């Protein structure tokens, strides 16, 4: 089990890194804006995170078309060796994931809400897939069961590359703190 922090706050990242348990970070421009950061400085902020964190740093592209996502993904990946390009699980994102993964750029497909989406993400070349556990619960689904289904389905296939599941959007309840560790590789 690995623990990733979902934040753009450098103080939080440094604190968690000092505990010796932080395996990686996931972040996006919205989280960065909450720290007072400006979108045009997002890439520099990712560099600073990568200087703190040895493990993967998933940085989300805000581009919406295949070509824009690929361009942004290449720019993000060039920032540091441990950058993982975070891309929404949508048609344009799947196409961009295929292209980037063929270039050796690791991708985290985020906003995954179903087993078929997870399978498509893995087939497109995603290294990480992020099902949104808490958001399943928000729509009256059992998020932990959905997570278990995604993990079981992905583990059922050989995609020709490693795929890890990140339990994303985990809410602060006892069940959501303990249960993802039974299913996902990363929480």
What are the language-model segments listed below?
Residues 81, 85-129:
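Hydrophobic, well-structured mid-protein blocks that either form specific transmembrane helices
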Residues 17-18, 77, 122, 178:
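Non-catalytic positions within long, well-ordered alpha-helices that form the structural scaffold/packing
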Residues 108, 115-178:
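Catalytic alpha/beta core domains of metabolic enzymes, predominantly
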Residues 6-9, 63-67, 87-91, 109-115, ...:
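Glycine-rich beta-to-alpha transition loops that act as phosphate-gripper elements at the mouths
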Residues 175-176, 183-187:
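Single conserved hydrophobic/aromatic residue that forms the stacking wall/gate
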Residues 50, 77, 94-104, 148-159:
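Surface-exposed amphipathic alpha-helices with a cationic face
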Residues 4-5, 9-13, 19-22, 27-99:
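Active-site beta->alpha loop and helix N-cap motifs at the rims of alpha/beta catalytic domains
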């Amino acid at each position: 089990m690995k623990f990733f922090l979902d934040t753009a706050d450098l103080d939080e990242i440094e604190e968690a890194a000092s505990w010796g348990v932080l395996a990686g970070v996931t972040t996006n421009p919205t989280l960065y804006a909450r720290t007072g950061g400006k979108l045009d400085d997002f890439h520099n902020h990712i560099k600073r995170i990568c200087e703190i964190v040895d493990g993967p740093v998933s940085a989300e592209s805000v581009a919406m078309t295949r070509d824009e996502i690929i361009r942004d993904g290449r720019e993000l990946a060039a920032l540091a060796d441990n950058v993982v390009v975070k891309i929404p699980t949508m048609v344009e994102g799947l196409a961009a994931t295929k292209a980037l993964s063929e270039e050796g750029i690791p991708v985290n497909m985020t906003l995954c809400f179903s087993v078929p989406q997870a399978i498509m993400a893995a087939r497109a070349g995603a290294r990480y897939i992020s099902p949104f556990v808490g958001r399943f619960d928000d729509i009256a689904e059992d998020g932990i069961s959905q997570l278990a289904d995604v993990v079981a389905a992905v583990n059922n296939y050989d995609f020709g590359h490693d795929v890890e599941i990140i339990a994303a959007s985990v809410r602060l309840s006892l069940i959501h703190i303990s249960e993802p560790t039974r299913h996902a590789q990363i929480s």
